[in-house]
Amino acid sequence: MKLTFNIDYRTNWGEQVFMTGNIPELGHFDRAKALPLISEGSGLHSVSLDISPATGSIEYRYFIVRDGNPIREEWGKNRVLRIDPKVGSVTVNDRWQDQPWNKPFFSTAFTDCICRPAAYDQPCDIQPGSICLMADAPMVLPGTRLAVSGSCEALGNWDPAKAVVMNNSMFPRWSVQLPLADLPQTDIEYKFLLLRESDHTVIGWDNRDNRILSVPESDGYSSLVEAGLFFENPLSPWRGAGVAIPVFSLRSDKDFGVGDFLDLKLMVDWAASTGQKMIQLLPVNDTTMTHTWADSYPYNANSCFALHPMYLRVQDLGELSDRHEQSRFDALARTLNELREVDYERVNAAKTEFTRLIFAQQGRNDLETPEFKKFFDANASWLKPYAAFCVLRDLYHTADPSAWEQYSVYAPSLIERFVDQHRNEIDYIYYIQFHLDRQLREVRDYAHSRGVALKGDIPIGISRTSVDAWISPRLFNLDCSAGAPPDDFSVMGQNWGLPTYNWEEMAKDGFAWWKARFRKMAEYFDAYRIDHVLGFFRIWQIPSNALHGLLGVFNRALPMSPDEMKYGYDFHIDTESQTRPFITDQMLGDFFGELADEVRATYLQHTGYGRYQLLDRFSTQRRIADHFASSPRDEKADRICNGLLSLVDEVLFIEDPYEKGKYHPRIAAQFTYAYRALNEYERGCYDRLYNDFFYHRNNDFWREKALWKLPPIIDATDMLVCAEDLGMIPACVPDVMHRLEILSLEIQRMPKDPSVKFADTWHYPYLSVCTTSTHDMGGIRQWWEENRESIGSFYNNVLGFSGEAPYFAEPWICSRIVDNHLKSPSMLCILPLQDWLSTDGVLRRQDPREEQINVPANSRHYWRYRMHLTLEQLLQADSFNRSISHMIAESGR
């Protein structure tokens, strides 16, 4: 069989088009054996090859080479040809696959869920003597089909009733085969169109000029393929609605005191019944470190691959043969499920006790099944070290590997022996993860069948006491912490206590760790939220001896030298005084009041001229905290401790951790006493330096860093990419997100335009997710009651009502706010369940303060919110559900 490939691509001088594929003639995807195409002029490149007729499916792709190095890749999946062995020759006319303008629609959120065909056609091989048209059309909703019509009888002579329906077996790629014998030997015009499947009513025609097809003569054996076509959808951009709820917050009649994975099937039912297309979750990875409620923080996982045992529906594993024990657990489950909030410690202890008993009773049988062996083989690379980590954590009563004696440094051979020596405990961990995986896959498949996509959450950080940091410490900067600059959530900034990433080390293997992490997530989810996407541009990095986020710097950034400050901004830095805490008598009175003299005598050293410095043993925030942690705490001790911690923040500059002798201006330095001590001219020079550094100087540098990291990572899967892009946003961020077609996050009360108080929902970008609130803030009702000073303006100027704003956010107010969001241009409107419920005066919770999931300013917050009604009750709330369905439909979603 002879294959001829043609592709239009205008190369620059010195560039050449190559192709590679899964057959020997194309090098088995080995770039060193790729096939060069010959330039035929006018941008056309061609190559012909002879292959065996029994080759089967052929996968291939093109790439561009300059000076022997690949410089450009095609976007998307490999091209696929299925050719009947009886075909003598095939000519394939390809188009270069660039990233399409509607890339999100090619994600599995659409191809496997929202636009998933009700049924797939049988694959059809390219037949002898035919023309095959292949067109990409992802945004074809269930119940509709792509068809082709044109200027000849075989294409219906432009009569839609006679249009040829295309094959969807490779959806979102559609194909149709037309016998050459049925086509006139001339140029014909044609167009793609959307038809309603039930009656072939036309929904819309290709939004472009007629296409031209040159029909060759037929010899009965040769075929032509026109590939790389693209349906220009004439319909309005698709917009959908969804709900956000953590798994632990779900409540059903079958729960064990906490939401579990199988509860999600009921949430899928509710979403589907009300016209919603997406369910957004918080991270579901295992966070067990101490077996206390402190482990409830879902962004501090002990593994980026393992699922949290808390989310296992333990009743699904079977019943205990000991009827007395089974009855005891049934009663305990009912007791825990009646609690208003999650009792993290009791729930996890009870589930662990039950699963250990059921494992002892029948778990070995599960570990002998083909399903388990398949699971183990696919996940062994992370599962074995994770299981060893869990056993070592419990054996040494700490998750800190540095306390694990000979196991503190991960050594594969040593861990293999440890696994063999603790086989029963290790197998129990395998057993739990196997069933968690099985249950979450069951939910994913069920969601697909209902046309609902599951959206996961990718935390920006990993725990320093995690499997990932233990086995691959080179990938992380373990001597510092990630966090965030000051914002509306925390005036001191945030210190998450998580290590930052060593991106240079990660890049050496093509970001393999990140790709594996995303691919694991893609086994369960079809969309994801990148937590703090700004961290891919630069991360706020805090030294290990600091506690407050105020002492952080951006990693990486372009720090300033003293000469640059002097000659560029006329600011003369005093590195001796302006990089160390600025402490004066006046400050001590302001910070400590009547305790100032005691503080001077105990913690400070006088350096002359009314200035002080902290004694060496109190010179860092870590040393101060450690000192007070070892002594009795009372109100006085707290005042002194907090005051000393704030004194350490009193600097104007912070030395760069990588380029010594160069400096970063301290974030929010204008609020320091050190800044006030400058004269007016110095403050003006400092402000110019500060504003240039944080808002202009690093933009191109950060853009380059993001475009180095993000494309290979997000292209590792076909999930829909959304991002949390709140906070101190560099000017380069919107451009990069638009270029990569990452959906932004839009929150009305956190506008990205600093000149306005509230964002305008009518002007949100299409590529965005809009929401009324997030897990880090109170819902509509709580915000309304706690922000009286701004609610009046919102009530009159945003909602359009006159008069004084009601004290409470009544259901009609919440409905107006929700309706405004639904009618926004955003592709997705995903609202917390609490805010959906706020529109119903009967169903909503009495006290909205009980609905806040997290308080970011409190690093010790207990994550325990649960919905106050069951999912079964929610599904039966007919009036409310009709109202939600109506609001969504009326908004055009």
What kind of feature is each model-predicted range?
Residues 56-60, 186-190:
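Exposed beta-strand face motif in extracellular beta-rich ectodomains
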Residues 9, 21-23, 137-139, 150-152, ...:
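Generic secondary-structure microfeatures
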Residues 2-8, 129-136:
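A short, amphipathic beta-strand motif
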Residues 48, 105-132, 179, 204, ...:
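Catalytic cores of glycan-processing enzymes that make or break glycosidic bonds
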